[in-house]
């Protein structure tokens, strides 16, 4: 079978809604696009622990602390799950981590902004994770089996994170005037970074058309962004809080909310490493990576020894080791 025939058969399978599995033939560009997307997603989960994780020691109350610890642990697990999905495409975890630490790999823009108040934790959990779940629910319908299955599990856990964030914001919105003002300030700061999460507008996206063709994605960036706005605006206003966009209004003709687009030049700067917290985020990951080196080396030695013992079952081992 020629490459053209293989491609035609592949695209027919994808168009039918069949899942592509690791051992299946796939176009090289499909594989590369998936590695890029899944790698960026995994990096975002790992780096995404940092903005909220700093608030664990200062969380207001034992229950808030426990839920925040659980959320940060979930994000670490999501990152590992996604790295494993990328490994099925031939990219090693070590390669992906090196690309992150060297600044070569990209991750979500939204994690490069500061979190100066407790309200930021609530707004990230509510707004940012809602935007993430809307995007990830779409990815769960995608054509690559390991990625789609990972998305289903991640969305289930992220729904808990949304509830955690929403509950925190509700408490602030119903609290003192100072607490409500803190919640509003956080929404003001996170609104546009959250809108940017879906990626550049379709007219500027170099990857969307091919990702849609091969069902790596089933909705465009603009469609996902609009779905988020339609979902979240009524919730914000129901709490007596404001959407920080005077042009945001419901359009009866379209059935959607109109809104002011983000500054796409800002998105480009932040994604390319020039955001408010890019350097600090990568520095924190480098520090954690270096401090965890002994664990990785110990696991590698243990794995080598175990393989050796499997190959040589007659080797005597010290039971006291």
Predicted regions and their residues:
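Internal, conserved structured core segments that host functional sites
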Residues: 111-164
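Acidic, low-complexity proline/glycine-rich segments
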Residues: 1-21, 43, 95-105
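Short, basic, low-complexity termini and linkers enriched in Ser/Thr/Gly/Pro
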Residues: 305-321
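Extended, helix-rich structural scaffolds rather than catalytic motifs
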Residues: 181-306
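Conserved alpha-helical segments that form or flank metal/cofactor-binding pockets of metalloenzymes
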Residues: 1-9, 71-99, 166-169
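Acidic/His metal-coordination segments adjacent to aromatic residues that form catalytic metal sites
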Residues: 19-39, 99-125, 142, 175-179, ...
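Helix-loop segments that flank and shape redox-cofactor active sites
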Residues: 25-30, 48-70, 132-147
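Alpha-helical scaffold segments that form or flank carboxylate-/histidine-based iron centers
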Residues: 30-41, 59-78, 121, 146-158, ...
């Amino acid at each position: 079978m020629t490459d053209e025939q293989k491609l035609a058969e592949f695209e027919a399978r994808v168009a039918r809604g069949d899942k592509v599995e690791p051992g299946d033939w796939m176009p090289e560009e499909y594989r590369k696009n998936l590695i890029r997307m899944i790698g960026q997603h995994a990096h975002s989960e790992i780096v995404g622990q940092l903005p909220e994780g700093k608030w664990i020691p200062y969380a207001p109350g034992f229950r808030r602390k426990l839920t925040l610890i659980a959320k940060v642990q979930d994000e670490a697990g999501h990152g590992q799950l996604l790295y494993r999905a990328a490994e099925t495409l031939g990219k090693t975890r070590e390669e992906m981590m090196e690309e992150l630490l060297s600044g070569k790999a990209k991750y979500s823009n939204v994690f490069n902004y500061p979190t100066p108040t407790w309200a930021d934790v609530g707004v990230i959990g509510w707004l940012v994770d809602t935007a993430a779940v809307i995007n990830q629910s779409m990815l769960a319908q995608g054509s690559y089996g390991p990625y789609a299955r990972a998305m289903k599990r991640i969305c289930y856990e992220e729904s808990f994170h949304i509830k955690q964030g929403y509950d925190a914001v509700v408490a602030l919105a119903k609290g003192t005037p100072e607490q409500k003002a803190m919640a509003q300030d956080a929404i003001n700061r996170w609104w546009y970074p959250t809108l940017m999460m879906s990626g550049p507008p379709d007219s500027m996206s170099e990857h969307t058309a091919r990702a849609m063709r091969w069902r790596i994605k089933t909705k465009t960036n603009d469609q996902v962004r609009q779905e988020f706005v339609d979902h979240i605006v009524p919730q914000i206003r129901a709490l007596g809080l404001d959407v920080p966009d005077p042009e945001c209004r419901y359009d009866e003709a379209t059935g959607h909310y109109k809104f002011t687009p983000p500054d796409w030049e800002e998105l480009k700067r932040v994604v390319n490493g020039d955001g408010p917290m890019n350097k600090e985020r990568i520095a924190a990951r480098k520090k954690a990576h270096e401090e965890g080196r002994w664990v990785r080396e110990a696991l590698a030695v243990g794995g080598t020894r175990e393989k050796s013992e499997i190959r040589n079952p007659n080797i005597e081992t010290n039971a006291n080791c």
